[in-house]
Amino acid sequence: MKITLKTRRILRWLLAGSLFLLTTLSLTPWQPALAQDPEPPPPQSVDPATLEADLEPLPAWSSPIGTTENPEALVTIDPATGLNIILPPAPPAAESASVSQMMDTFVQLATGEERAFGSLTVVPNPEDWPDRTAVKMWSEYPSGATTVCTGILIDSSVVLTAGHCVYTWEASRCTGGATKCWADKITVAPGWENNNSPYGWVESFAVSGDFIVWNGWINSKDYDYDMALVKLDFPIGALTGWFGYGPNSDSWYIGRLFHSTGYPAAPPYDGSDMYTWQGSYDTIEEFALVHENMGYGGQSGSGTYYWNTATDQYFVQGVHSHTRTYYSPPKDEVGNTRITTSKFTSIYDRIQDHTPDIYDLVPMDINTDSSTYNRGDILGSMNYYVFNHASVSKSKTVSVSVYLSSNDTISIFDTLLSTHQFTWNFPANGGVRVTVSPGDLPRIPYNLVSTDSDEDFWIGVILNVSDSDTSDNAVRDQDAKKLTINHTIFI
């Protein structure tokens, strides 16, 4: 049994024993989609809308620099030493393809057959399935430079993207005379649109071993291996869903319709909106899927995928990697680094390794009937989602504490409003939306606001369970619900 607990996470609360009332809750399987002790400081999470990012140019293809022994190997940073390490070889995968997980009502994409990829078109509702599985990425490097790319969720907590979005060969982004280096931090935001992240964002760090890149890219800048995994320590895919992925034979690609969704940021685009295009590949190569279009910076890492209309499943086939320009005759091409059988096996193995094999319940997405209340009000309704981030199912009676905080970090040092329980059989990588029953809805305290003006507070929950990772049993800052409490008392 191997479970990785993130040591960098802030321990925001301690488990305290309490007597909880047994109550009946309305449970609906979600269709995806004040103490004397000081409170710990809130996490230093940075809203990506505030980042000043440079364009990540879509690189032009070039020959590999020398040769690399074992280019199929995966490389990450050893958190203990800070040095690159090659991960052990992956065993044979248990499946021939990984299936997508839809977490909400299905939204159909255009299905008109085309001989080649058409023009980019703006996605009108990027917060909807299936487009919200695409994430905008900000990569921050040792020099302080920040660049933007795209990625695709292929698990509740794993993003697939281009290797050059994670490990750069641009010396200007590195320090200490290095000519190539890892990004220090990567921030991802699903369904991003015009500085709005409807599902919040997640940060990952190189020093925690969150980034995995193919050895062929790291040592030879080989575009056949321009692919990377970004592991997330929050399963944001529980709110958005995720795509499957898998390899196929050369002949399988002929005549089929494919899609690619991302965030072009080079003129005439500015990276603020999600765009998509669709069509058939013009050339099928051993390590690349190629179509005759001009690519744009910011699209790097976009997943190119196939929609199986018979099963309503989506399968990522590769990632947007590089451009190729020809002058006789003149044409531009986009090369997508292909998921080969070997790459699929490695991806599958690393996702399994990243997923706990003991249940891990994570609360998220707090909703209330209003965002403004008076002192003494009882909430009209409240619900939240609980996700089991694990490879195993778990039947569990869960005791829950509801807190009100003066900031968005929910802890046991905040004001306890109410408690309740629910029982559910959690599937692996699945969850339930909990609707608090009327008799257990929390009341806003009468003595909460001491000033002569309205004040902002945040409401959230803590799950009182001893699962595989107790650091995520409190709702995270972005999922706590902000409330405005009127200072006037209405009786």
Q: Positions of the model-derived regions?
A:
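Conserved catalytic-core segment of clan PA serine endopeptidases
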Residues: L109-R132, W138-V148, I154, R173-A238
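A short beta-turn/strand-edge loop motif at beta-sheet boundaries
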Residues: A171-S172, A178-K180, A390-T397
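Extracellular/luminal regions of secreted and cell-surface proteins that mediate adhesion/ECM remodeling
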Residues: T355-I491
